[in-house]
Structure formats: C-alpha cells, structure tokens
Amino acid sequence: MTTNIVGKVKWFNPTKNFGFIEQENGGKDVFVHRSAVDAAGLAGLNEGQDVIFDLEDKNGKISAVNLRIK
C-alpha cells in the first residue's frame, strides 16, 4: 500500500457514490468510493478539495482509502 499521497478532488458524485482524485505528483487519477469517505468520517468531498490518502490495490483495482483533509 502506498501511503500519504497528496491530491485534489477532481469530482465526486454523492448520488453515484464515487469520484476521482487527481494526484499532485501527476500520476493517474484515483478512484474513490463513498465507503472510504464514510470511513474517514467525512460528509462528502468537494471538487478542488485538497486531500491526503493511501492507495489500496484490491484485485488489480486501485482506490483511495484512509482519506484526510489537507
């Protein structure tokens, strides 16, 4: 697991329960699911919001977990 990645919320759709985070280091955009938002105790994510997160690989699918507001 890669930890403490800095990024910015590209978009998050609360109706569809997912979105994407743009990595500050220029890497690929990272999928974020509502369950990670809920686990972080956040009400939601806003476009352009700065976040810190870890990358989790589940069966070859990368997603953001352990979200923190920067």
Swiss-Prot record:
GO MF annotation list: DNA binding
Principal cellular location given in the protein's record: cytoplasm
Keywords of this entry: Activator, Cytoplasm, DNA-binding, Transcription, Transcription regulation
InterPro entries in UniProt: Cold_shock_CspA, CSD, CSD_CS, CSP_DNA-bd, NA-bd_OB-fold
GO cellular component: cytosol
Subcellular location: Cytoplasm
Residue ranges of every copy of the CSD domain listed in the record: 7-67
SUPFAM superfamilies attached to this UniProt entry: Nucleic acid-binding proteins
Keyword check for DNA-binding: yes
Xref: Pfam families: CSD
Superkingdom of the source species: Bacteria
Protein name: Cold shock-like protein CspA
Gene name per UniProt: cspA
